[in-house]
């Protein structure tokens, strides 16, 4: 029996907001496949780095610095759920597997009121449901990783699944390489190295009717880096009567770093009628980083005594959200589209550090850290309206409440965007946005490394906020070319910069007093 695969049609009405907003870019699967490729694998973040107003930071890394902001100022959403860690291999690969990605919306200005929580940009990534009619999949091998994807119906026309797994295979190369180098090393030094990353995307979708759909989605990503070095040492000690004795020992250095993400969400899409849709999401999102290292310095004193100094330290950073959101999309008529919604997030920040120093048999153990919690509640409304044939407006307001023990804050965030059609081929656009950010990425360096940790605005640390004005001319040229010229002015307040001594790990007990507060303009 011949079958025709499902056809997907995107209406012009559904993209109305994209026509009004400044600084907006919509990317689909073909943009990733034929866009930037890293070691033969498509990469979402690398594709965004080529856009005007976006900087990559360190060469080849997955940094995203938008309109003068930091990498931590960007809101990354996977099917409406925030992600805190968005890269593998220290930033060389992004955490988004393009085998399951359906498309994304990227905003660097003109943010609609439905988005909030970060100052500089929004990367809203959506994944595909599984095929409801037939089974199919793909298998790809890259220079550093391999990808496997499979989807299909469980109950034809009703229930489907979509599963994708990506894994690096660098560990298969590192093990024999280090073994060969150790064999060739004549001074007895032994080195060890191992690195692996993998991520899993899975979704299960059931259609109860033409008006109700329930989806269970999961993402799990993990990196692990292990390094070790053993140095042989030979030392001489005088034991009496001028007699010297020679003994051999080893100095040791070992590091184990693990970091990753876990996202679980339950999505309910309900259609009230042909003009009103409601989406409700309940989710858990969490990110963790665990950095452990051990160092031992062997020394020989006398015939009977061998001593050593040793350090064993563990640094753990965890952040997680338990949250729910609901959004209503009401198409009042062909010229007016109203969106409104509410969200609640319970944030948990849990950084800790434990160290043990053994100095010639004298053990000194220390620990530091604190558990922080915060509650964030938001309401928003935005109206997309066409006034005649030439003018489109998107006006919205977002109200945010953020509460931590000892401090209650609330903010209004006005949003306004407009588009005026000068001719069939030329549009003028302008926007104003006000954003607040209540989460701070605490770092003692400028790299995206697992030693950084997320902490909330507290009684003593105010939230960051930005105001941005943008305007531009957007023109359509012959042969489907586009020429866009856009300018922006952005101010940022309550920015944090580490003011302590050079160290790899940020201070946990005194972090609120270890940073300078400043302002920024771009």
Where are these regions (language model features)?
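Face-selective signature of the C-terminal outer-membrane beta-barrel domain
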Residues: 205-223, 253-407, 421-424, 481-485
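Extracytoplasmic beta-strand/coil segments of soluble accessory domains associated
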Residues: 39-40, 45-82
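Predominantly transmembrane beta-strands of Gram-negative outer membrane beta-barrel pores used
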Residues: 75, 103-112, 120-128, 135-187, ...
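Short acidic/polar hinge/loop motifs at secondary-structure boundaries
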Residues: 34-36, 81-107
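Outer membrane beta-barrel strand-and-loop segments of large Gram-negative receptors
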Residues: 321-325, 367-372, 378, 458, ...
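Short, acidic, small-residue-rich periplasmic hinge/interaction motif at the N-terminus
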Residues: 1-36, 45, 71
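Transmembrane beta-strands of outer-membrane beta-barrel pores
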Residues: 127-129, 143-145, 154-156, 167-171, ...
């Amino acid at each position: 029996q011949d079958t025709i695969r499902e056809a997907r049609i995107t209406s012009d009405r559904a993209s109305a907001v994209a026509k009004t907003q400044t600084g907006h870019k919509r990317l689909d699967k073909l943009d990733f496949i034929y866009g930037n490729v890293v070691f033969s694998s498509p990469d979402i973040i690398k594709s965004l780095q080529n856009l005007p107003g976006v900087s990559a930071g360190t060469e080849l890394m997955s940094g995203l610095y938008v309109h003068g902001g930091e990498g931590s100022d960007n809101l990354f959403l996977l099917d409406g759920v925030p992600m805190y860690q968005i890269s593998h291999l220290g930033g060389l690969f992004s955490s988004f597997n393009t085998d399951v990605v359906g498309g994304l919306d990227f905003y660097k200005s003109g943010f609609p009121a439905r988005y909030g929580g970060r100052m500089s940009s929004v990367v809203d990534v959506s994944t595909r449901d599984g095929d409801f009619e037939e089974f199919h999949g793909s298998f790809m091998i890259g220079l550093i990783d391999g990808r496997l994807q499979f989807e299909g119906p469980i109950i034809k026309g009703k229930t489907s699944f979509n599963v994708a797994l990506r894994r690096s295979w660098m560990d298969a190369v590192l093990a024999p390489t280090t073994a060969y180098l150790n064999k060739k090393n004549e001074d007895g030094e032994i080195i060890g190295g191992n690195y692996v990353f993998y991520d899993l995307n899975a979704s299960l979708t059931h259609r109860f009717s033409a008006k109700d759909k329930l989806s269970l989605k999961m993402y799990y990503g993990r990196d692990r880096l292990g390094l070790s070095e053993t140095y042989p040492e030979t030392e001489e000690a005088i034991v009496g009567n001028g007699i010297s004795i020679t003994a051999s020992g080893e100095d040791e250095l070992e590091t184990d770093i693990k970091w990753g993400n876990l996202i679980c969400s339950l999505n309910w899409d309900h259609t009230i009628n042909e003009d009103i849709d409601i989406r409700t999401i309940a989710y858990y999102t969490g990110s963790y980083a665990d950095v452990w290292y051990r160092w031992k310095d062997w020394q020989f004193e006398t015939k009977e005594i061998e001593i050593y100094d040793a350090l064993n330290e563990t640094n753990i950073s965890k952040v997680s959200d338990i949250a729910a959101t609901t959004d209503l999309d009401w198409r009042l008529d062909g010229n007016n589209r109203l969106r409104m919604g509410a969200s609640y997030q319970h944030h948990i920040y849990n950084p800790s550090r434990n160290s043990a120093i053994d100095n010639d048999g004298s053990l000194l153990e220390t620990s530091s850290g604190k558990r922080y919690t915060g509650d964030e509640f938001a309401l928003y409304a935005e109206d997309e309206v066409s006034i005649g044939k030439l003018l489109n407006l998107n006006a919205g307001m977002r109200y945010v409440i953020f509460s931590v023990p000892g401090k209650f804050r609330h903010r209004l965030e006005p949003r306004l965007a407009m588009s005026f059609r000068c001719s069939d081929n030329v549009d003028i656009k302008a926007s104003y946005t006000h954003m607040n950010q209540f989460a701070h990425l605490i770092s003692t360096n400028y790299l995206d490394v697992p030693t950084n940790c997320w902490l909330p605005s507290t009684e003593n640390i105010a939230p960051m906020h930005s105001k941005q004005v943008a305007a531009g001319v957007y023109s359509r040229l012959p042969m489907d070319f586009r020429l866009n010229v856009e300018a922006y002015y952005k101010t940022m307040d309550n920015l944090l910069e580490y003011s302590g001594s050079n160290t790899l790990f940020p201070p946990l007990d005194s972090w609120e007093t270890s940073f300078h507060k400043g302002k920024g303009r771009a």
